[in-house]
Design a protein with these regions (language model features):
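Cell-envelope/extracellular polymer assembly enzymes that use nucleotide-activated donors
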Residues: 2-4, 36
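Conserved donor-nucleotide/metal-binding helix-loop-beta segment in metal-dependent transferases, i.e.
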Residues: 101-125
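Active-site nucleotide-sugar/metal-binding loop of Leloir-type enzymes
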Residues: 79-89
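Acidic donor-binding segment of Leloir-type glycosyltransferases
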Residues: 24-65
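Short, well-formed alpha-helical segments that are part of the catalytic scaffolds
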Residues: 12-27
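Conserved nucleotide-sugar donor-binding
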Residues: 86-87, 134-149
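Short beta-strand-to-loop acidic/aromatic patch adjacent to the donor-nucleotide binding site
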Residues: 88-98
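C-terminal catalytic/acceptor-binding lobe
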Residues: 18-19, 147-225
Length: 225
């Protein structure tokens, strides 16, 4: 099976390697060597390590398309990767998550066949009920990612825009709110079964970087403490 993977990354080859290694080992019914990775690598914390990230990506994926922007920007990164994808569904894989157990990708794709309005299958990273999209690892249908790719406002957080919060943003997608029943499925359904681990939080605590001191809506990059 061939599928586009999209990744928004920082220049952290060790973190990226842990992420791709875990998904390569635990995703079933798909071979990453048959897939294309579309990756945006921001110049943080060290821009000169971006080539190392591409080398890591090439270990796992059959084809890698990369972008080296001059400035780090979360929304711009999403715009770039999604506007370059073209498969019916994509696997959106942020660079600092580890998959802890096997997941059958074909099983996840059958959800889109069973539910016409379905836009995203979220892999469970938290115990709460998912009624809004999160950009932790997920599978997106093209009716979602193609509507957003290239159309996100760069000074507003992409998750906020995709959730349809009221910040005066008019997106080209008429039903951008994902709170309606049938547009999000969380896998696995059992809230106690967390299959993802965030490895980015522990990394950031050990560095000189932190989140911008702004509201969630305005968070688009990291800054030095």
């Amino acid at each position: 099976m061939k599928m586009d993977f999209t990744t928004v990354a920082m220049a952290r080859p060790d973190i990226v390697d842990r992420t791709f290694d875990s998904f390569s080992k635990n995703l079933r019914k798909i071979n990453l060597r048959d897939c294309r990775l579309i990756i945006n690598i921001d110049p943080l914390p060290e821009g000169n390590k971006r080539k190392e990230v591409v080398k890591v990506a090439n270990k796992y994926f059959g084809e890698v398309i990369h972008n080296y922007p001059e400035k780090a920007n979360f929304s711009a990164a999403c715009n770039w990767v999604w506007s370059h994808a073209d498969t019916t569904c994509i696997f959106h894989l942020e660079d600092d998550w580890v998959l802890k157990e096997p997941v059958n990708v074909r099983e996840l794709l059958t959800f889109f066949e069973q539910h016409r309005k379905l836009q995203v299958v979220q892999l469970r990273a938290y115990r709460f009920t998912y009624n809004k999209i999160a950009l932790s690892p997920c599978i997106m249908h093209k009716k979602l990612y193609q509507a957003m790719g290239g159309n996100l406002v760069e000074n507003i957080n992409p998750e906020v825009q995709m959730r349809g919060e009221k910040f005066g943003i008019i997106m080209p997608y008429p039903t951008k709110k994902l709170t309606h029943k049938g547009k999000i499925i969380t896998y696995p359904k059992d809230k106690k079964r967390i299959i993802l681990k965030d490895i980015g939080r522990s990394w950031i605590k050990k560095t000189e970087y932190t989140k911008q001191k702004v509201k969630k809506a305005r968070f688009v990059t990291w800054e030095k403490k």
